[in-house]
């Protein structure tokens, strides 16, 4: 069960996804929160610039390895609008980050894209737990799925 604090951070991640969409990018956003509850870093998708690795979860992993101790990384939580892709899951694991809370799952995104006739991503959409065994993961969160789906629909011209 997610706390109201968890939900506040998760809503912020979805707000960042909307900011990405408004900037012409794919709608994904993420927030890194310390074990004490302090927001350490947040970002949104930036792949529209031409680098397909500019995912917010990957940015969090890179940022955290140079600014946060291993113990603090393990105690932190990453809140994200969508479940990590395999690239971001691997970066999360290698960085030693802790818990992940996501609003919508990769399986949901794949289903929506299939429904809309959008070609699949070039990388298999594996669940985070298959990439980072033993990681604490919570999601999807039903109360935010409709909003995330609407953002994805707008991006893919289906709204």
What are the roles of these predicted feature ranges?
Residues 23-27:
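Short, flexible loop/turn motifs enriched in small residues
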Residues 13, 29, 60:
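Conserved hydrophobic/aromatic pocket- or pore-lining residues that grip, position, or stack substrates
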Residues 62-95, 99:
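Helix-adjacent hinge/juxtasegments
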Residues 28-34:
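Short beta-strand scaffold segments in enzyme catalytic cores
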């Amino acid at each position: 069960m997610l706390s109201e604090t968890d939900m506040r951070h998760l809503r912020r991640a979805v707000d960042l996804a909307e900011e990405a969409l408004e900037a012409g990018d794919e709608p994904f956003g993420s927030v890194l929160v310390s074990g004490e509850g302090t927001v350490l870093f947040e970002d949104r998708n930036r792949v529209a610039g031409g680098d397909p690795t500019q995912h917010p979860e990957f940015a969090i992993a890179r940022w955290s390895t140079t600014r946060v101790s291993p113990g603090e990384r393990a105690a932190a939580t990453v809140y994200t609008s969508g479940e990590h892709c395999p690239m971001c899951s691997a970066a999360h694991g290698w960085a030693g980050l802790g818990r992940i809370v996501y609003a919508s799952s990769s399986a949901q995104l794949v289903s929506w894209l299939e429904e809309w006739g959008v070609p699949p991503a070039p990388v298999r959409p594996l669940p985070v737990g298959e990439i980072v065994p033993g990681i604490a993961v919570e999601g999807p969160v039903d109360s935010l799925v409709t909003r995330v789906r609407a953002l994805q629909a707008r991006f893919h011209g289906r709204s």
